[in-house]
Amino acid sequence: MSILPAVGQDEQVPHYVRQPGVAGKITSVGSDTLANLMTFWSQEFKTLYPHVGFQIQASGSSTAPPALIEGTATIGPMSRALKPSEIRDFTRVHGYPPVVLKVAMDAIAIFVERRNPLPGLTLKQVDGIFSQTQYCGGNGYINHWSQLGLSEESYQGPIRLYGRNSVSGTYGLFKIMALCDGDFKNTVNEQPGSASVVLSVASSIGAIGYAAYGYKTAGVRALPLGETADNFIPLNSDTVRGEQYPFSRFLYLVVNKKPGEPLPTLEREFLRYVLSKEGQQQVVRDGYFPIREDVLIRQRRLLAQ
């Protein structure tokens, strides 16, 4: 039985309908997590509109707000919500806040090498593994696999930690969600992208790392998580879209839209495409999860305000 709320028949997600006179260039600056998805969207959009060009710079979510403030980007992909300070900085310059659209769902996964027999982790264990400060109630540092009950010879050594760098939205959100805004251990090997984290974990039987689930490969396994070992929650479409999985999150596109005025035609049509059946099919293609229909309809309404 589905755990997702239904949407009224008059509010079904529409197909995208091609419009005349769409041309120009979209500049995207922001999230590495959304880099592949932005590429998929741009490629499909260009098949509809051959005279549209894209420039995509994916250096991390923290680069999106300054680029939108300065006008060097038309769209800012982000894997986390805007901080209050980022909204204030934008509003100070433009006189109104940016429009933030939810465009996909993802989860920050805890990956281990695919043969690792660990059944799952409690949230306190996650804190003990990754955090120096353990603000989430970790019961002491967990530095060796034996502390998690693994007795196999392959897991007699220390746990090797992998994660993202500080400019990443994934880093910032995991810090809040998993570490209760505590500090990471200095033994976390920081990587420039989620793909690098997954590759590192897949290449090392004693490794564990956090990364965007959309970058999962056959070489890794995403661990179930829970408050206790008796209620581990697997990472799948239902638990992410229903927000039961502890580290579920939305992915966003942020734009500069003046209240009461329409976006320029090119930006408006690209966002309408993203928030259509065809755009959400690309979300699935990239390994992420489409947003619920009720959420998507609300995002389309934001474009009309």
Where do the model's predicted regions map?
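Flexible loop/hinge segments at secondary-structure junctions
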Residues: 4-305
